[in-house]
UniProtKB/Swiss-Prot annotation:
Protein name according to UniProt: Probable protein kinase UbiB
Family affiliation: Belongs to the ABC1 family. UbiB subfamily.
Function: Is probably a protein kinase regulator of UbiI activity which is involved in aerobic coenzyme Q (ubiquinone) biosynthesis.
Gene coding for it: ubiB
EC number: 2.7.-.-
Residue span(s) of domain Protein kinase: 119-497
Annotated keywords: ATP-binding, Cell inner membrane, Cell membrane, Kinase, Membrane, Nucleotide-binding, Transferase, Transmembrane, Transmembrane helix, Ubiquinone biosynthesis
Length: 521
């Protein structure tokens, strides 16, 4: 289908499902709304607007379904009724021909499939818009037979994606320029985010790298299993990972009859998530029930099994500090501190008044404290803070929105397992430990130890730097302001070098002594 024909199809679907009322209600040009009223044949206006939007996206195909799924995570931009409905979108499409999957594998590895795998199951076990999964057996580097899951990219996706993305970018530009809410909704930014997300999913090596990173991070935590990646069998279009065997986590009755401790399972999920967030700053961001199983094998009984690593989130130290302090200030009911954190983040316009933001946050948060602590949703706390921030034109960072969406998934899953789950009691030790690590002497020691070689290298250069500085003093007394400022900056740099160099020298000696002592004993 040509781009023009596809564009006509999209416009027809928008009008058929009455989405013009949703899109054009904030447009500055009344004549646009009048034109759309002329086209009334076959319109479906009896359902709520969120349902109509979901059905329209489903009728436009898998790329628009995935776009709706991404939109559902942007609850800082979407009204709750629309975000809730979009969260129901399912990325399910019929599997493609196994012969096409085999041809993709043979093209990727330039070998017949019989030379790549010991055996290959032609029947796919899962299928989505981007890829489908087959089971197979390989020989690893030691010659052992290993059961694996093979993810194969759906062929011909890139041209389809690029065509739909071009149309989305064009429509986003129209909405941003014509709608009164265009700037707040940031449609072009959302489409650009979706563009990056889709192209990341089209590179299965990237997903393999995400899985390998999570597996390495989680090795010391005996609560979760991450499949091993077989790099010799990975390609941009083919991903081969260890086959994991478990029970889907939403089959609670089956897990309970197998003897799994369900309340502990709920707590373990929270522990895994907060470990990934506050310890590692790298978290699995697609933890819905379809991507989580529970092992019933005797040696790993009751452990989580994580699958599908196409979406991950990363947090900087600043992001983690923002989250930890927001949560602790909220539970202390210190709304002024919450407001100050928003302003200190630099995401709030400079003219924002702390007391006004504090009052708005108090209005949102105070009703939560009429409930038992175990009923308070940290994900909803973040969501309400984001929604309040929107009124003050706060620029919420995408990684925090992704975390908020994932946190809601974790809470929903945890309370599905155990309605009495107290999320705060489970999360609090992580927040306290992380803040202690950030503020305590251990962090200072880690930073000094990391910089010791650099400071020790600077120290021998200090006499020469001091000599050069003294020789460059002006010969006359006429010194303008710019030269004074430049001289002051040079002096500050010199003093900083002296201080850091001295610290580095002392620290270097300590580290060397410690190293020698360890070698001796």
């Amino acid at each position: 289908m040509s781009r023009f024909a596809r564009g006509i199809t999209i416009v027809w679907v928008v009008l058929r499902y009455g989405l013009d009322e949703l899109v054009l209600s904030t447009f500055r040009q009344p004549w646009l709304r009048a034109v759309t009223r002329v086209i009334t044949f076959g319109r479906k206006l009896d359902a709520p607007r969120g349902q109509r939007l979901r059905e329209a996206l489903e009728s436009l195909g898998p790329i628009f379904v995935k776009f709706g799924q991404v939109l559902s995570t942007r609850r800082d931009l979407m009204p709750p009724d629309i975000a809730d409905e979009l969260a129901l979108l399912q990325d399910r499409v019929p599997p493609f021909d196994p012969d096409v999957a085999i041809a993709t594998i043979e093209r990727a590895f330039r070998r017949p499939i019989g030379e790549v795998f010991v055996s290959f199951d032609r029947q796919p076990v899962a299928s989505a818009s981007i890829a489908q999964v087959h089971f197979a057996v390989i020989r690893d580097r030691q010659g052992h037979a290993r059961e694996v899951a093979v993810k194969v990219l759906r062929p011909g996706m890139l041209p389809v994606i690029d065509k739909d993305l071009a149309l989305m970018r064009m429509m986003a530009g129209w909405v941003e320029s014509l709608s009164a809410d265009g700037k707040r909704l940031k449609p072009r930014e959302v489409v650009a985010e979706f563009d990056n997300y889709l192209h990341d999913e089209l590179d299965l090596v990237r997903e393999a790298a995400n899985a390998a990173q999570l597996r390495r991070n989680m090795q010391g935590l005996d609560l979760v299993l991450i499949p091993e990646v077989f790099w010799d069998f990975c390609h941009a279009e083919v991903l081969v990972m260890e086959r994991m065997k478990g029970v889907p986590i939403n089959q609670v009755d089956r897990l309970r009859s197998a003897g799994v401790d369900i309340p502990k399972l709920a707590r373990d999920g929270v522990t895994i998530f907060f470990t990934q967030v506050f310890r590692d700053g790298f978290f699995h961001a697609d933890m819905h029930p379809g991507n989580i199983q529970v092992s019933l094998a005797p040696e790993t009984f009751g452990r989580y099994i994580s699958l599908d690593f196409g979406i991950v989130g990363t947090l900087t130290e600043f992001d983690k500090e923002y989250l930890a302090q927001n949560f602790t200030a909220f539970f202390r009911r210190d709304y002024k501190r919450v407001a100050e954190l928003h302003i200190e983040s630099g995401w709030v316009p400079a003219h924002t008044r702390v007391n006004e933001l504090e009052a708005a946050i108090r209005t949102v948060c105070e009703p939560y404290f009429d409930r038992p602590l175990k009923e308070i949703s940290l994900g909803m706390v973040l969501l309400r803070l984001f929604q309040t921030s929107r009124r003050f034109q706060v620029e919420i960072q995408p990684q925090l929105v992704l975390l908020q969406k994932t946190l809601l998934n974790i809470e929903g899953l945890g309370r599905q397992l155990d309605p009495d789950l107290d999320l705060w009691s489970t999360a609090k030790p992580f927040l306290e430990k992380w803040m202690l690590d950030q503020l305590g002497p251990q962090r200072l020691w880690r930073e000094l130890r990391a910089e010791a070689p650099h400071y020790a290298k600077i120290l021998p250069d200090l006499p020469r730097l001091l000599h050069d500085f003294l020789r460059q003093r002006p010969n006359d007394n006429r010194v303008d302001l710019q030269e004074l400022l430049a001289t002051q900056k040079r002096t500050n740099r010199l003093l900083q070098s002296l201080i850091y160099g001295g610290l580095g020298f002392v620290l270097g000696l300590l580290v060397m002594q410690l190293f020698v002592r360890v070698r001796i004993f």
